[in-house]
Amino acid sequence: MTAPAERTVVVTGANTGIGKATAEALARQGWRVYVASRSRDKGEAAVASIKAAASSDSVFFLALDLADLSSVRSCAEAFLARGEPLHVLVNNAGVAGVRGLTKQGFELIFGVNHLGHFVLAQLLLDRLTSSAPARVVTVASDAHYSARGIDWDALRRPARGITGLGEYAVSKLCNVLFSQELARRAAGTGVTTYALHPGVVASDIWRRVPWPVRPLMTRRMLSVDEGAATSLFCATSPEVAEASGRFYDKCAERAPSPVATPELALTLWQRSEEWSAPYMA
């Protein structure tokens, strides 16, 4: 997928890190870019920075708090009200090393990394379909390989571990499962979907991981530009146009965890629909 004419992308968490690098690269290619982030100040600063770096006037801000499904709905409504097509949604935003609950009472890492993005994608799916060919790109992680499954009860309480890395792994497994099930449901519509591992990137996602652990994690990390490479590959490469539902690492297909079964993907989808129903009507 190239951009000979202006195409439109929404990138969550594009105020910093991999998301900003992804948004800037697409803006340089002539895309119309929406920076969706929780902080208006940081988001608008990123918009200004991307505009300057890409010499583009087609970069805009959308307010989005993935920890509040009301905000997710408002974000989708704000975009849809503009009447524009949507060719790519990049589910990039994420948190790690945090404790707490979302506004709707879900474990915070799961709520931000999976459930908020699930709702956003559902609310934008009709627009993606009408703009096809279109893609949904979800930034997961190879951390999902360490998740042994989903403890459904744990999704309703704050993280119990010191680092939150167990909860992070489960949230990334959910990203992979979401992409798989969306691929099944969107088959034949012209909307394709991809999950990916960006590499271990020196980004703001690790800022809340406790000090004794953080320095060990951040050694030899990739730059944000290097980390954005696989997101850009999944968003634009013609090589993956027919490879919906696959998992990518270093711009190449990789087998996901054996825990990522179609049965678990369906169960997660159904539960996510139930949990988010009040915000989908």
Give the residues covered by each predicted segment.
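A glycine-rich helix->loop->beta "capping" turn
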Residues: 55-58, 78-91, 97-102
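Canonical Rossmann dinucleotide-binding motif of NAD(H)/NADP(H)-dependent dehydrogenases/reductases
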Residues: 2-37
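N-terminal Rossmann-fold cofactor-binding loop
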Residues: 14, 36-40, 44, 66
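Conserved hydrophobic beta-strands of the Rossmann-like cofactor-binding core
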Residues: 8-11, 89-90, 136
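C-terminal helical subdomain
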Residues: 171, 195, 218-254, 260-266, ...
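The beta1-alpha1 cofactor-binding region of Rossmann-like NAD(H)/NADP(H)-dependent oxidoreductases
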Residues: 40, 62-77, 103
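Catalytic loop of short-chain dehydrogenase/reductase
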Residues: 94-103, 107-110, 129-189, 197-214
